[in-house]
From Swiss-Prot:
Keyword Manganese annotated: yes
Protein name: Probable cytosol aminopeptidase
Location(s) in or outside the cell: Cytoplasm
Family named by the database record: Belongs to the peptidase M17 family.
EC number: 3.4.11.1, 3.4.11.10
GO molecular function: manganese ion binding; metalloaminopeptidase activity
Lineage of origin: Bacteria, Bacillati, Actinomycetota, Actinomycetes, Mycobacteriales
Active site, per annotation: K291, R365
Listed cofactors: Mn(2+)
Amino acid sequence: MTTEPGYLSPSVAVATSMPKRGVGAAVLIVPVVSTGEEDRPGAVVASAEPFLRADTVAEIEAGLRALDATGASDQVHRLAVPSLPVGSVLTVGLGKPRREWPADTIRCAAGVAARALNSSEAVITTLAELPGDGICSATVEGLILGSYRFSAFRSDKTAPKDAGLRKITVLCCAKDAKKRALHGAAVATAVATARDLVNTPPSHLFPAELAKRAKTLSESVGLDVEVIDEKALKKAGYGGVIGVGQGSSRPPRLVRLIHRGSRLAKNPQKAKKVALVGKGITFDTGGISIKPAASMHHMTSDMGGAAAVIATVTLAARLRLPIDVIATVPMAENMPSATAQRPGDVLTQYGGTTVEVLNTDAEGRLILADAIVRACEDKPDYLIETSTLTGAQTVALGTRIPGVMGSDEFRDRVAAISQRVGENGWPMPLPDDLKDDLKSTVADLANVSGQRFAGMLVAGVFLREFVAESVDWAHIDVAGPAYNTGSAWGYTPKGATGVPTRTMFAVLEDIAKNG
């Protein structure tokens, strides 16, 4: 058993023809679609040319008929096809035929196929040849994300016996296929890094350890790193981080990770600067306002925002984005104890705003407020901030759709990009009248309202108070989407999902390209 998590992503290669040798143990993943005949539903192979001969396609389709396959979405079948040099064929259903395929449909299909591979270590696929934008990258992302596993804390008795997916060969004739495939692999590997961090239990991942891992990851790609310990935080006036963390014997940290990408730009003076902020509550009991015991173990995921930000900024460095990206990551453990903050306490946030703590379980916004003010001191053009902020997010949008709040135009831009990459963020309003619900009789603000309703929006309004007026800002609330408590689906496993890593990185790419 190892206690150092780290999913080892498979290698990725691109080929323009079906390999003829050395693939006897590999599985060929082939997409199939429904025939559309209601009285006699069936499945036919999609995206076969130029990789499969007509007689091979006929052989696969005959096998599908024998299994009564319909080509429905997520339907998989394993076939022996003697005319091929591979060990077996795995077909994955896409549903009804389309002229062009949405990238996330292919990403999900690849993920479904990867989860059905069992002990197979090498795959070849024709999925990437389907028509549509971003299909090659999506294929690789789906295969890697779908094959993700986390077994660092399992003994030999329960650990997987196989090595997992180790090699992916993408069949694709596009000129930029290799570039697109490697891009998809890099993105998926970053998501896996975020998943690893979130899945690590709080016994092994506390503020100092999370800071250490963030530092190690960041230095490996050349980022500048600053780790601020509890003494320095207190001296500098980070009242939110200190207040939340003071109940734990494991003190808080704040980490700054800096990618100086403007020097890679054609015109460095015009390169944009983006601030990232992610909530790093390594475990959240709720503090004195303690949570119910039944689902408290899921609060190992309360640093999902921090994990995504760490993964995103390291990916920006790895892929050499020509913009400056500065991540500010506050880290604390929210515990009840004789030294914990109490409901009714008043703390002074970094920057001087005073906050009455009416509920110690609304702690994320307190550490985020400190980090936001610090991030805005760098005078960024944009601020993207993410956290498992509110249970109200799941009430409003469910467990798969992040809520996106912030400056209207930038909020909509982030939400649109999130939908394009398949993380499906949805824009939410921040009505000005909700600020009245945050009035305090003893401080500048209260950390919660006295109302039952609009909890996500109230939290967003609270955070907005700490954002500089000159900064375009978006907050992504991933309270539900960051951690899947149900069954695996598509390329999403049970447990940590890595959301919203892909959204944030795609926004960075968009800013690098379009300003």
